[in-house]
Amino acid sequence: MSDSSKEKKKKFADMVSRQKGDDQQSDNHKQTDDLNEDLNTLKERAVQLEDHLRRAVADNENVKRIMQKQISDASDYAVTKLARDMIDSCDNLKRVMEILKDGDPVHEGIKVAYQKIINDLKKHGIKEVDPLGELFDSNLHQAVVEREDNEKEPGTIVEVLQTGYTIKNRLLRPAMVILSKKSADCGND
């Protein structure tokens, strides 16, 4: 074999080798592009899953907080029905004390029993609402009638007919009240 044919064979082999290298490089680029695309898809999916996880954890915390509030409220307000019955009994004891004379031993006994019940109610978060002299608040009071009184601002509570009660800052029973109003002839002086 001559040098020129050896040289031609070598050039041909180099060309084939380069062609194979180009094909292999092209295949490598295609595989790299495919892998990058797969990687980006997986990254997007990971971001979505992380977002779903965050939302699920937040929802779980909200449900937990709501349940704790409901349990707390159930505990705080479980005595509501009993409390309503007890305040009716307190009203009856008050009426009896108003009828009996102050020095009467029965009056004193009822007064002690009444005070004991009121103190026990307070231990459970039940408080009296005695708004005498305050301005009317429809959230806490129930107006029964208006009475002419030019000395007080209209809407001022001048008499409490029935004491109101709250349980842990929630209205149990509104106070029944009489409100002041200006007399009709007040402006005709």
Swiss-Prot record:
PROSITE patterns: GRPE. It comes from the Bacteria. It is found in: Cytoplasm. Residues 1-37 are annotated as: Disordered. InterPro entries: GrpE, GrpE_coiled_coil, GrpE_head. GO terms for molecular function: adenyl-nucleotide exchange factor activity; protein homodimerization activity; protein-folding chaperone binding; unfolded protein binding. Keywords: Chaperone, Cytoplasm, Stress response. GO terms for biological process: protein folding. Gene3D superfamilies: 3.90.20.20, Head domain of nucleotide exchange factor GrpE. GO terms for cellular component: cytoplasm. Residues 17-33 have a biased composition (Basic and acidic residues). Belongs to the GrpE family. Participates actively in the response to hyperosmotic and heat shock by preventing the aggregation of stress-denatured proteins, in association with DnaK and GrpE. It is the nucleotide exchange factor for DnaK and may function as a thermosensor. Unfolded proteins bind initially to DnaJ; upon interaction with the DnaJ-bound protein, DnaK hydrolyzes its bound ATP, resulting in the formation of a stable complex. GrpE releases ADP from DnaK; ATP binding to DnaK triggers the release of the substrate protein, thus completing the reaction cycle. HAMAP family: GrpE (MF_01151). Homodimer. This is Protein GrpE. The lineage of its organism: Bacteria, Pseudomonadati, Pseudomonadota, Alphaproteobacteria, Rickettsiales.
